[in-house]
């Protein structure tokens, strides 16, 4: 059976769908209802209303997982209490989000960080966030004319990142795919450049 049931806070209102389901579980199936975990909504930064794909104010899940590594999506969702409203910004703040995750991955500050890191990476066979800051990859990738092979070579020649490239080349290549898609679809013009 199901032990825990997360759902949007609108389903947690008195007399809402959770209360109805709880009665059905008890009176029809003679089972205990799952433990409820209501969560708040995700808004786009600057919006006061929850995202809604039907109203054109949302970001669809497919786009999010195409632009962000799965461990970062989990980090975004799990780093705060489910009761806290989250604000998603696919532009500038996305770079900071990936960099924050990478920093926590490299140097967890406490047991809570270690637990969060486990939850973000559990079951992922191929990590997609390297030890090189995403912000640096965004710049390096564009400086290398958006060529993954050239970007890796530039990073390898850097005294700061050579060892990381040797240890994490496959992860870096995978992460550069996210960089490329983000630059193409969501990056603000202020972060884009082209060398002539």
Residue ranges and their predicted role:
Residues 1-22, 28-29:
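Divalent-metal (Mg2+/Mn2+/Ca2+)-assisted nucleotide/phosphate chemistry catalytic cores
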Residues 30-31, 70:
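Short, well-ordered coil loops that connect the C-terminus of an alpha-helix to the N-terminus
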Residues 31-43:
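Glycine-rich phosphate/pyrophosphate-binding loops
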Residues 190-192:
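Extended, charged low-complexity segments
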Residues 195-196:
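C-terminal accessory/binding modules appended to enzymatic or scaffolding proteins
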Residues 13, 18, 25, 40-186:
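Catalytic adenosine-cofactor/nucleotide-binding cores of aminoacyl-tRNA synthetases and other
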């Amino acid at each position: 059976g199901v032990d825990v049931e997360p759902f949007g806070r609108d389903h947690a209102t008195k007399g809402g769908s959770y209360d109805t389901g709880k009665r059905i579980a008890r009176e029809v199936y003679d089972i205990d209802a799952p433990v409820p975990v209501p969560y708040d909504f995700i808004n786009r930064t600057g919006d006061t209303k929850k995202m809604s794909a039907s109203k054109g104010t949302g970001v669809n899940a497919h786009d999010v997982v195409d632009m962000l590594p799965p461990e970062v999506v989990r980090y975004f969702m799990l780093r705060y209490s489910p009761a806290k409203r989250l604000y998603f910004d696919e532009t500038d703040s996305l770079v900071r989000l990936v960099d924050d995750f990478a920093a926590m991955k490299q140097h967890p500050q406490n047991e809570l960080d270690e637990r969060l890191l486990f939850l973000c990476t559990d079951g992922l066979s191929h990590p997609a966030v390297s030890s090189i800051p995403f912000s640096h990859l965004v710049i390096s990738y564009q400086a290398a004319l958006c060529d993954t092979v050239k970007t890796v070579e530039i990073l390898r020649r850097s005294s700061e990142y050579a060892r990381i490239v040797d240890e994490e080349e496959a992860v870096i290549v995978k992460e550069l795919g996210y960089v490329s898609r983000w630059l193409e679809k969501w990056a603000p013009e202020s972060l884009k450049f082209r060398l002539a």
